[in-house]
């Protein structure tokens, strides 16, 4: 069996391999499952399964169905996990199903270890390990807690990337709106009121007559938005123009103007 140092180095190699790219949670699950000989689940604070790996021979049909079909744990069970504020090791299931205490577990002597994933002074998720008959050792727990730290950092990085992407999309929309004349802005508001959701068919002449502007104003407004990359348009000839919104912040920013 590899030493703790060797196992830690394996985890570090996953980090080094990723470089500036996000770490793949499935890679962490695969490694932990192999070196700890257990089932591994990385669960978000809301119960979504971010990564998982079943160890060969340790497959529970009930859990497998949840993981593969639902891709999330039931709320009541996730709440139990979130109530664990520090590592809880070798918790027995008393031969009962974790999702239904009235139902017997198909596999006896199941032991679970729950490791909270924290970062920036908040709970980000849970690292859940499960195996049968053999208890998790202190060495196993050190590796699990180190892994939880790595996962926490990656979740925080992912959140920050998402925040930055949202800000970028909003800024692009605001710049695009800023290029419009008053009449073009008025035309745009009517155009997107006509759309059914994020895409639809636009007949420029109908909107021009309805608003009392020229068709060229509508065409110019659409061209500016298309140049900014916030929409995609395709002429269908006499039928009109098919428009699809590419930036999901567009409608939100237009509502603020009204």
Swiss-Prot record:
Question: What does the protein in this record do?
Answer: DNA-binding global transcriptional regulator which is involved in the adaptive response to starvation and acts by directly or indirectly controlling the expression of numerous genes in response to nutrient availability. During rapid exponential growth, CodY is highly active and represses genes whose products allow adaptation to nutrient depletion.
**Disulfides per UniProt:** none
Q: Name one GO cellular component term.
A: cytoplasm
InterPro entries recorded for this chain? CodY, GAF-like_dom_sf, GTP_trans_reg_CodY_C, Transc_reg_CodY_N, WH-like_DNA-bd_sf, WH_DNA-bd_sf
PANTHER family in the cross-refs = GLOBAL TRANSCRIPTIONAL REGULATOR CODY, GTP-SENSING TRANSCRIPTIONAL PLEIOTROPIC REPRESSOR CODY
| Any single biological process term in GO | regulation of DNA-templated transcription
Q: Which residues bind DNA?
A: 204-223
> What family does the Swiss-Prot or TrEMBL record give for this protein?
Belongs to the CodY family.
- Specify the superkingdom: Bacteria
Q: Which gene encodes it?
A: codY
Example of a GO MF term:
DNA binding
Could you tell me which residues belong to the region GAF domain?
A: 1-156
Protein name, per record: Global transcriptional regulator CodY
